[in-house]
Amino acid sequence: MILEHELPQGSKLYFDMSARLKRDIESCAIKAFYENDYREIVTPSFAFLEHQGDMFNREIVRLSSENNHQIGLRYDTTLDAMRIVTKRIMRSSTHKKWFYIQPVFSYPTTEIHQIGAEYLGGESLSPVMCLGVSILQTLNLAPYLQISNMKIPFLCAKHSDVDIEVFALQNVGKLLQMEGYMADLVHIKTKQDLQKAILSAPAFLKEELERLLECASYCEYEKTIFSPLLFAPSPYYEDLFFRMFVGNSTLLQGGKYSVEEQFSCGFAIYTDEVVECLLS
């Protein structure tokens, strides 16, 4: 028996102080976005399953249309927004910077509120990353900023005959058993660690390690951690990637990616996690 006060597992309820905080977070982000020439986009909650990236993903909430087309509830706004901008909006607008405030959904009943920014054709991740950092700072939050480069684990796997799954599973124990540069990469945390590693790194890694260092130089943030071997959680992040976290909670993540053959960069703020952090 389902009681009247019960809610589906994974759904979200905000009221009073939590609802006010949620609105304050959104207002803070909106102000920052407009000041940086971003425009808002609201995408449909439903999309054809074939447009959802991995149509075999079991976490997508599925249903059928009246014409028997497979439909999915929005699972990833980055994919949706960039597809709509490149295939539909660009017929009438050449604007490149877009932001959104809307939830995504996953099976069976999980709802995740997000605030995101996407810079279509953005070549440098640094300004986008700094925008995300500044929004959380305005909210008086000081999470750790962790920066990585997905090209580094792929290069290491290629040149060391190590299965990429070792990096994907973050098998630190196995990586530390390897001699030379691999163990050095695991120990990198600070800017000084990274600068030192660049001096002794193999030639095939130097450029990507330097790009990792350069990415952070644009945004001086005290609580910055470098993690060259960190594996990004989203498959379309294949380059520079960053996240901001407190404890086990990720408040923001983003990076450089390619969607619909367009190289872009962006980030998403996880509103639910930020609200919880502000309430604690």
UniProtKB/Swiss-Prot annotation:
One Pfam family linked to the record: tRNA-synt_His
GO BP annotation list: histidyl-tRNA aminoacylation; L-histidine biosynthetic process
Localization terms from the record: Cytoplasm
GO molecular function: histidine-tRNA ligase activity
Record keywords, A-Z: Amino-acid biosynthesis, Cytoplasm, Histidine biosynthesis
Note, other: This function is generally fulfilled by the C-terminal part of HisG, which is missing in some bacteria such as this one.
Role of this protein: Required for the first step of histidine biosynthesis. May allow the feedback regulation of ATP phosphoribosyltransferase activity by histidine.
Protein name: ATP phosphoribosyltransferase regulatory subunit
